[in-house]
Amino acid sequence: MAPKAVLIGLPGSGKSTIGRRLAKALGVGFLDTDAAIEQRTGRPIAEIFATDGEREFRRIEEEVVRAALTEHDGVLSLGGGAVTSPGVREALAGHTVVYLEISATEGVRRTGGNTVRPLLAGPDRAEKYRALLAERSPLYRRAATIRVDTNRRNPGAVVRYIVSRLPATDACRAAT
């Protein structure tokens, strides 16, 4: 069992929105690993970061991602920082990984004042976002088998683009 598609990208790139719509188009389930982490731990991600630190959060995240990659056969959405873990990047090999690309300007606009995103909290959000983009873009690009620009594109157009580039067996299911 393996996911039909694994979505990666920065906060605000549309992983949850696109993921739900893509899953519907393919007639499969959707799993957001951030939600799975919160369900497993019984704690919000921001609390895990604040109490246990980013390192512990990434350890839990890697366990959840590895399990999802073997147990979930629908569309999987990873947290924005999951690719910073070498173990997660290794586990993604051989999967259909879709990088939802976004500019810093659009990402800051979409994330607004969302306090659920611990790495973007506080002042200078735009600068923090640009730093995350610079740090993570090379990791996303290396992990991705499909890249799609989400800037100024509606979710329906992004989903259609992804479906058109999925391996034939998955794309055929979406057409039926």
From Swiss-Prot:
One of its GO terms (molecular function) is shikimate kinase activity. Pathway: Metabolic intermediate biosynthesis; chorismate biosynthesis; chorismate from D-erythrose 4-phosphate and phosphoenolpyruvate: step 5/7. Keywords: Amino-acid biosynthesis, Aromatic amino acid biosynthesis, ATP-binding, Cytoplasm, Kinase, Magnesium, Metal-binding, Nucleotide-binding, Transferase. Binds 1 Mg(2+) ion per subunit. It is found in: Cytoplasm. Substrate binds at residues 34, 58, 80, 136. ATP binds at residues 12-17, 117, 153. Pfam families: SKI. It catalyses: shikimate + ATP = 3-phosphoshikimate + ADP + H(+). It is an enzyme of class 2 (transferase). The keyword Nucleotide-binding applies. Its EC number is 2.7.1.71. InterPro entries: P-loop_NTPase, Shikimate/glucono_kinase, Shikimate_kinase/TSH1, Shikimate_kinase_CS. Mg(2+) binds at residue 16. One of its GO terms (biological process) is aromatic amino acid family biosynthetic process. GO terms for cellular component: cytosol. Catalyzes the specific phosphorylation of the 3-hydroxyl group of shikimic acid using ATP as a cosubstrate. Monomer. HAMAP family: Shikimate_kinase (MF_00109). PANTHER family: SHIKIMATE KINASE, SHIKIMATE KINASE 1, CHLOROPLASTIC. This is Shikimate kinase. It comes from Mycolicibacterium paratuberculosis (strain ATCC BAA-968 / K-10).
